[in-house]
Amino acid sequence: MRVVFSEDARDFQRRDWTDLVRADPAGTIFHRPAFLKLYWEEFGETPDHLLLTFAEDEDGRQVAAVAFERMDDTLRFLGGTEVTDYMGPVGEPSTQTQVAKELWAALVQRDDWRSADLRGLPEDRPWLGLLREAANEEGLVVREEDDQNGIAPFLTLPPTWEGYLESLPAKLRHEIRRKAKKLEAEAGPFRIIVADRDSLEPLLDRFVELHRMSEGPKGVFMVPGMEIFFRRLAAAFLPEHVFRLTFIEVGGQLAAGTIGFVCDGTSSLYNSAFDRAWGSLAPGMVLVAEDIRLAIDEGCTVFDLLKGDYGYKYRFGAVPRRVRRLVVERP
């Protein structure tokens, strides 16, 4: 096996590794080269700090990939913690143990880093342990700890909506139904709108507007640069039916919206916003329930609420997934 490094951003496309993302159970939208390329173009600090890394087998076939960025003398997975929930390598499952060993063996030969701060590694995926063990074997000093916002609740979905409801504790099932009935009783029938090519721009405008109306840190998140990133995500992934912008319309008003991704059997809730004028009727909660229903109808087996240990996520029956961080230093 051979490890190849590249500092050329053109290799996001020239060495496209989307097939490896799909082959790896750890692969997510955040590992796709199209997502990482977009992140790099919008948030990359300096062009010469990119380090794309590929593993090739004896036949020269690409079997694994990981994108890094270097900040001073620290090596990090590419992807900011504010917008990238999971990070790290992807590869063919049968090669991952060897890839982890060869990766560290190649990295220690480089003199452009002293420490590695590797975030976004889910505890229930092999890469966390493989990278930790391989770094130890290479004589590096390794520390494992919780990542920032290091809990990502998720649901395992049954084949039907009724099956999902029946899988919940009675109290949660009752609350989901009660919120929808209360919204209809007090505001009239609601409608779920999923953005398509024609409606995307005005719906994104409304989503950004609602986001900036939020209280606290959420209200200042959607700065112009972040808005551009979200719009570029939509433009890149809506045609592939990966990007999902959903609204709940009540009384002729778009009361709440969610942005998510539908990717390889997993539907993810990436961001949300709601009109505070409707807060007492919880349209956002009703909308998330409808997002789950839509995911089930589309055959998804997982609904990932992503990082952030917020109480509302558990009202849908989610269970926590820990997301870990490896801090690796040269001795």
Where are these regions (language model features)?
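Acyl-donor binding region in acyl/amide transferases
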Residues: 70-148, 264-316, 320
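Conserved beta-strand edge residues that scaffold enzyme active sites
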Residues: 197, 309-310, 327
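A conserved beta-strand-loop-helix scaffold within acyl/acetyltransferase catalytic domains
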Residues: 2-59, 65-76, 121-152, 156-280
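Short functional hotspots where side chains directly engage DNA or cofactors
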Residues: 315, 325-327
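Alpha-helical membrane-targeting segments
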Residues: 329-331
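Short amphipathic alpha-helical segments with coiled-coil-like heptad repeat character
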Residues: 25-26, 321-324
